């Protein structure tokens, strides 16, 4: 099964076996490494929880739209777009996700090195920095055309 999933992307090198990554509560997340003559590059592979997100196409359209928008904002302010927002790696068919033969849906992101994802606030400073990051995120999206977003969890 995993071979089918990995074959859906064009990898520039040899692909390691995906290993579980992080402590996510919704999607199943894996890290993998692609090694080539140019070196090693890490990626995040996620199995989308389609019990929660029943419209994976709409979900991925939202994610791609928002991250493309944020990437342009990052470029405009001189920030590194590779660190400023997630980057969805398209499949070999140029789709933002792959639906496997069993119906499961998978996506790949570039791994953003030297970052952390807190599962729980440990200090007031953690809470403050999380609030600052969320405020910046909201500010950057102020001009985003919200009417284009799909409702991915109805009545949530």
Task: List each model region and its residues.
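Juxta-kinase regulatory segment immediately upstream of eukaryotic protein kinase catalytic domains
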Residues: 1-19, 70
């Amino acid at each position: 099964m995993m071979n089918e999933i990995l074959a859906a992307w064009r990898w520039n090198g040899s692909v390691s076996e995906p290993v579980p990554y992080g402590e996510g509560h919704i999607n199943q997340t894996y890290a993998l490494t692609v090694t080539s003559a140019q070196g090693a590059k890490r990626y995040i592979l996620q199995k989308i929880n389609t019990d929660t997100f029943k419209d994976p196409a709409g979900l991925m359209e939202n994610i791609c739209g928002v991250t493309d928008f944020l990437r342009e904002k990052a470029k405009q302010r001189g920030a590194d777009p590779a660190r400023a927002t997630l980057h969805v790696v398209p499949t070999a068919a140029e789709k933002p996700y792959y639906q496997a033969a069993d119906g499961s849906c998978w996506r790949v992101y570039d791994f953003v090195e030297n970052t952390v994802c807190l599962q729980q606030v440990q200090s007031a400073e953690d809470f403050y920095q999380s609030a600052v990051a969320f405020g910046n995120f909201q500010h950057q999206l102020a001009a985003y055309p919200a009417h284009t977003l799909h409702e991915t969890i109805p009545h949530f």
